[in-house]
Amino acid sequence: FSLSNYSYTAIEGDTELEHFSIDFDKDDLIPMIKAAQEASEDGFKLFASPWTAAPWMKDNNSWVGGKLKPEHYSTWALFFSKYADAYKAEGIDIWGFTVENEPMGNGNNWESMVFSPEEMTLFVQKYLGPTLEAKGQEDLVILGFDQNRGDLKEWVDVMYKDKASSKYYDGTAIHWYESTYDYFPKELQYAHHKAPNKHLIQAEACVDSEVPAWKDDAW
């Protein structure tokens, strides 16, 4: 996890992302990824999950909560393309993305940006998918949802409603939270049968300390 808020698109109003930069990642994150690649005997695939757009793209001008302004949908789609290109230039191939980490929100404890199933599907169908296709990056995997399993049905019903809505989705991402008391087998089966030829991937799992009680822990 990052120790601070930062964006690759820090310049407000840079809708063409002419100043897009991953320099912040070059000291620690990229060397860590390369070290892991060198240590792995079998190799692994990398996918990325944005937690929020830069505040200037959002309706609440904040790192936390709020929604992507509709006028910045094209810019945000370009962001994914630029990110993949920038990492490739560093010798790291990105396999794919989730569209948004925890699009239903996270209690405003961390960076976040809210999408409804309909909003995310519109973004993927009309902006992200066509942008990657136009840039020759159609092999990049796009995973929708990316939150807890209990809400799968509502999301996959929208994502995989028809051929048009599902065209650019390569699968569904899920988190393990809440699964300590129920692993939601019916929801998992429903999502699988809704789109049996698409990925259903566990995208995040961590044991996070209670917020803000972690500040009382001995470090």
Q: PLM ranges: what are they?
A:
Residues F1-W95, V99, S116-E118, L122, ...:
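N-terminal catalytic cores of secreted or lumenal carbohydrate-active enzymes
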Residues W63-G65, E111, M159, D217:
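General N-terminal targeting signals
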Residues S74-G96, P103-V211:
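Active-site neighborhood of glycoside hydrolase catalytic domains
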Residues A213-W219:
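Short, intrinsically disordered, charge-balanced linker/junction segments flanking boundaries
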